[in-house]
Amino acid sequence: MKILLLGDYSNVHATLALGLRALGHKVTLASDGDTWKNYPRDIDLKRPSLGKLPSIVYFLHLLRTFRQFKNYDVVQLINPCFLPLKAERIRPFYHFLRRHNRKVFLGAFGMDHYWVEAGLDCKTFRYSDFNIGNKVRKSVDNEIWIRDWLYGEKGKLNKEIAENCAPIRPPPGQG
């Protein structure tokens, strides 16, 4: 099977790639190496800078690189924000992947709309980033995550991908 793993957190996709290759699958891992952790990958998607000119150059690099991401049997996204871009700029890359590949799966790794929502209900998890027991935790980081993932573009992108991709994949042992 031809498999594309896009993005990485905590070496999850790098480790998965090793296991899938050992089983005889053809696997390509494209990521930024989880930024400073610099995990191994086949195709480097590291963004060198947030400046205007480097961002334009990076965007052009992505356009060229994504031409290679066609005709895979399976594409797994680490998270809705599988590229180091604003959510609204990721959307066309996601649609490209859907058009040119057999199945696209969304991994439930890292922060996302559903994790924030579940943490705030104070029922799904006894403890999370957002709650301790039945009390919501207040912090600056949480306020940013709530704004971005429940009401912002990240949340909109997350819901769109979740509604039209193949089934969402939770981390091993959590689903």
Language-model segments: residues:
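Membrane-proximal helix-turn-helix segments that form the acceptor-binding/catalytic region
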Residues: L63-K70, P92-R99, S128-A166
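Short catalytic/ligand-binding loop motif for oxyanion handling, primarily in non-cytosolic enzymes
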Residues: V12-A14, W36-P40, L83-K86, D112-E117, ...
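N-terminal subdomain of nucleotide-sugar transferases
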Residues: M1-I43, R99-N101
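Active-site regions of enzymes building and remodeling cell-envelope glycoconjugates
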Residues: P40-G51, G175
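Short N-terminal targeting/anchoring amphipathic segment
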Residues: K2-L6, F66-R89, K103-G107, I168
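Glycine-rich, highly charged phosphate/nucleotide-binding loops
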Residues: P48-Q68
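Active-site proximal beta-strand in glycosyltransferases
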Residues: A30, V74-Q76, Y94-S139
